[in-house]
């Protein structure tokens, strides 16, 4: 099978955040009327929906649309502060993997549940713009994961000819489900985000890798 586009998730797949995302969620929902039990349940929901659109997660947890928007803004502020402080760094092998994939003639697209502004701040802080062809957030595609919109938008914008030319990689069930729904020819899961290998396999991953460093070999790069 020939692949022309590789779609790589950011946090947990190419980017190490050492619980920065979880801490940002916790900070964003604290003091918003949740009981202690409600807070704990909300954080369980956050962990279970990692990889999905952040604003959609807040809407499910908090219910009220305006409160969700406020919480999302607080999340973005917390995460952006962590980025500026240098707390968010590349995972080992991520830069080399993207470089190898592009050198082999494939296009590289980074996918994230972050807003475009947070995504762009992260790209600039990491210096990754020269390494990629495109970066997409749910706001660019219509819906976030687990829907297929992000990889399908990458296919359209980067001029792919068929969905089977897509290869996707991520660290959560939502990443796997999105790739499968898009019809990608390769849907890989990685263990760097903490999801157990059995869970990634049960979600339908075609391959389970220790890290994104193993992706180029699967793509013949």
Locations of the language-model features?
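N-terminal helical cap/lid subdomain that shapes the substrate entry/recognition surface
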Residues: 2-96
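A short, structured active-site edge motif that brings together acidic residues
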Residues: 45-46, 128-144, 165
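Short, acidic loop-to-helix structural element flanking the phosphoryl-transfer center
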Residues: 81-110, 116-120, 148
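Surface-exposed amphipathic alpha-helices with a cationic face
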Residues: 95-102, 155-156, 176-181
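Conserved Lys-Pro-Asp/Glu-containing loop-to-beta segment of HAD-superfamily phosphomonoesterases
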Residues: 145-176
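Short acidic, glycine/proline-enriched helix-loop-strand junctions
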Residues: 151, 164, 199-221
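Acidic, Mg2+-coordinating phosphoryl-transfer loop and its flanking beta/alpha structural elements
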Residues: 167-207
């Amino acid at each position: 099978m020939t692949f022309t586009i590789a779609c790589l998730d950011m946090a947990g797949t190419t980017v190490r955040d050492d619980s920065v995302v979880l801490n940002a969620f916790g900070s964003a929902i604290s003091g918003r009327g949740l009981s202690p039990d409600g807070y704990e349940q909300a954080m369980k929901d956050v962990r279970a929906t990692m990889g999905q659109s952040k604003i959609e997660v807040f809407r499910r947890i908090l219910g009220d649309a305006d409160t969700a928007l406020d919480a999302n803004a607080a999340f973005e502020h917390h995460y952006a502060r962590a980025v500026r402080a240098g707390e968010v760094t590349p995972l080992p092998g991520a830069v080399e993997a993207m470089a190898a994939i592009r050198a082999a003639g494939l296009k590289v697209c980074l996918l994230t549940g972050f807003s475009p502004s947070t995504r762009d701040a992260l790209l600039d802080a990491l210096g990754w713009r020269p390494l990629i062809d495109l970066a997409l957030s749910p706001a660019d595609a219509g819906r976030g994961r687990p829907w297929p919109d992000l990889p399908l938008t990458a296919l359209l914008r980067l001029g792919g000819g068929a969905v089977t030319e897509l290869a996707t990689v991520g660290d959560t069930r939502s990443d796997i489900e999105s790739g499968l729904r898009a019809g990608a020819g390769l849907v890989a899961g990685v263990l760097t985000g903490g999801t157990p290998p059995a869970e990634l396999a049960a979600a339908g991953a075609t391959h389970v890798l220790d890290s994104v460093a193993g992706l180029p070999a699967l793509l013949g790069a």
